[in-house]
């Protein structure tokens, strides 16, 4: 039977006209459809077949037109009337409603319409659409709104707006009414964004959208674009097709969205219709072959049933209806009404049936009565009925326990979309990823973390990579979010597990879990070459100033020792010969001449002994304090010498952010879209503000699209570029080959990575609890060690330091050898000079002695012997210096 019905539906209205046009059982019905109402027309055709009877058939005459064009509507209506139609089904808008109602009242032609209800009394107009005013006012009172914006489409009439304004005046509501019906389609997106930005300035976060589906979708798109669909905003969609719009894109934003639904999909009658509706071929019936139907299409479908029931009732009452001879000119003056039109109007108003939109019944004015409208709210798991409104009961809330934001029911049967970003070591493609599918293609810290979170929360998930490869920032001009944050905000993903920094601007549009990793902004530079120790690196343990002070102290001590030795009588003594006899000379000697004082001080400083020592108390005091001084200096020097000689040092040109800000030779930048750039842009600290001023004006640009690009730029810059990034990533890259980058200085700030979910998502609390549990169990630390250090390619931090400090190279002590060789050479040179000097002096002495011998040969021998001994003693023994 269903197959036969399906085949019969495919018969075109033209064929019906040819077959039944001359039959007395054929009832001509007019149809005025606006262009683009494909689904409504398909529902009309299906109703024509579905509700046809053996007693008679409805034969349609269809015109497609612009309902906003009164001239086109007039021509079409008159054309239908002249064809002898019994009733007309059609649509109108604000511009054509008066034309149609005027013709209907004048010509007595009934007009059945699913368009918006009109105010006042219009005979011969049958309103299929229930009035929404009562339900809307009840919902406003239920939410206790006293201040809100009302966006209305003037093409739908102003009756609902007037009712709201009347109630506002009575109850002292503050209503901002804005007409969006006249917005230019070419600039509608820009104008919608501007409109909501103006509302934001007025703190208007409660908005009623009194528009049809297409305009609501356009507005919602721009609301999402500028991020006004998050927690803290509440929208009421004031039409009867809450589920008709594309709710998926706003479902996970966090904003409260409420509305009204006339088609109850839980009703068995609706379910049966949808089952048949979904089997129709869309090519033959545009808009069909779906599991949903627009409320205007549902009203159209049951308008056919209303007409069928009306004519059936007339047949039962044996009232003969005929247009033979009554097909006149609608523009005749005076107009000639159809005599039997009153009977048809009465029959239509008396119809009472159960349809897709509930109980269908009309009052004497052709308006719907005894109807029920479902009250809907949008939750993260889809639209949910919270109650209903009727003329008798008014608003009744049936959902006594609203689902909390922590409700995870339904997740078991849903695959959660996890957005992330390719960033080592958080998420990486496996080497053989081309041979794998799904989540198995990825590896990394966040991949393991996602598996742990899913295990604790009990849901299935699918990893997806952010389309633009960015973390998420809002464009300053368009206010559009990009990256992973954008995918959460615009409903493309359910959760983001990635190195996503928790920031204030992001927290305004998405929810974050507790941090799963703490970090801060750090500086990455190219690792400088290890500095080779200098020839005189043994001097490094003490500063240049200390060495100079030691030299001056050495000279000063030697001079003081020389002086006190000269002034102290206890430092002088007489010379003795080897046989113990006292010398015949009355002169006393002093061992501490200037050169011996220098020699004593040098020997004490070098921790070596000396053949002479002070005899006087004053001299010994000088020697004692000098020994104490040298003890401390030499001990300190020795303590530092090992470190300076054995450890290879790397001299970094930059040690902190202050160093970067004070120079321009080394460029520095951040990721072009991320929290690091936002930190510098918003910072009020002088150093960071100065760095931001440089970065935003630098040419070429110092910003990079990805972290990999930033690292490559550091490595290729030969030390002329520094990259500012999170410390965790900096530490990881430092452990990867070619091991040529390093982190310098401390962290510039303190922050954390968190798992992000859309505002108000049911995943928020379970994910947060899972992170805390993993932290307490030490799983997060194990994951970090696994991906940072266990898989490192540059060795553990400070590994091998003991081996490197245990051996010295020749370059470490080359200076000591140079001094030794220099000292030996100097000694040889001094010895040569002494030899030459002595030889020359001896030659002169021998010459003088020979001349003296010639003059006094008798006494020359003894004098010569004594002089020779005395002179030799003075030269090679203890010198005697007179002052």
UniProtKB/Swiss-Prot annotation:
It catalyses: Ca(2+)(in) = Ca(2+)(out); Na(+)(in) = Na(+)(out). The modification Phosphotyrosine is found at residue 876. A lipid is attached at residues 610, 836 (S-palmitoyl cysteine). Residues 1-24 form the signal peptide. Keywords: Cell membrane, Disulfide bond, Glycoprotein, Ion channel, Ion transport, Ligand-gated ion channel, Lipoprotein, Membrane, Palmitate, Phosphoprotein, Postsynaptic cell membrane, Receptor, Signal, Synapse, Transmembrane, Transmembrane helix, Transport, Ubl conjugation. It is found in: Cell membrane; Postsynaptic cell membrane; Postsynaptic density membrane. GO terms for cellular component: AMPA glutamate receptor complex; plasma membrane; postsynaptic density membrane. Residues 592-607, 608-610 dip into the membrane without crossing it. The chain crosses the membrane at residues 544-564, 617-637, 813-833. L-glutamate binds at residues 499, 501, 506, 675-676, 726. Phosphorylation at Tyr-876 is required for interaction with IQSEC1 and ARF6 activation, which in turn triggers AMPAR internalization for persistent synaptic depression. Palmitoylated. Depalmitoylated upon L-glutamate stimulation. ZDHHC3/GODZ specifically palmitoylates Cys-610, which leads to Golgi retention and decreased cell surface expression. In contrast, Cys-836 palmitoylation does not affect cell surface expression but regulates stimulation-dependent endocytosis. Residues 25-543, 638-812 are extracellular. The modification Phosphoserine is found at residues 683, 717, 860, 863, 880. Disulfide bonds join 78-330, 739-794. The keyword Ubl conjugation applies. It is a multi-pass membrane protein. CDD domains: PBP1_iGluR_AMPA_GluR2, PBP2_iGluR_AMPA. Residues 565-591, 611-616, 834-883 are cytoplasmic. Glycans are attached at residues 256, 370, 406, 413. One of its GO terms (molecular function) is ligand-gated monoatomic cation channel activity. It holds the Pfam family ANF_receptor. The postsynaptic actions of L-glutamate are mediated by a variety of receptors that are named according to their selective agonists. This receptor binds AMPA (quisqualate) > L-glutamate > kainate. The M4 transmembrane segment mediates tetramerization and is required for cell surface expression. Belongs to the glutamate-gated ion channel (TC 1.A.10.1) family. GRIA2 subfamily. Ionotropic glutamate receptor that functions as a ligand-gated cation channel, gated by L-glutamate and glutamatergic agonists such as alpha-amino-3-hydroxy-5-methyl-4-isoxazolepropionic acid (AMPA), quisqualic acid, and kainic acid. L-glutamate acts as an excitatory neurotransmitter at many synapses in the central nervous system and plays an important role in fast excitatory synaptic transmission. This is Glutamate receptor 2. It comes from Pongo abelii (Sumatran orangutan). The gene is GRIA2.
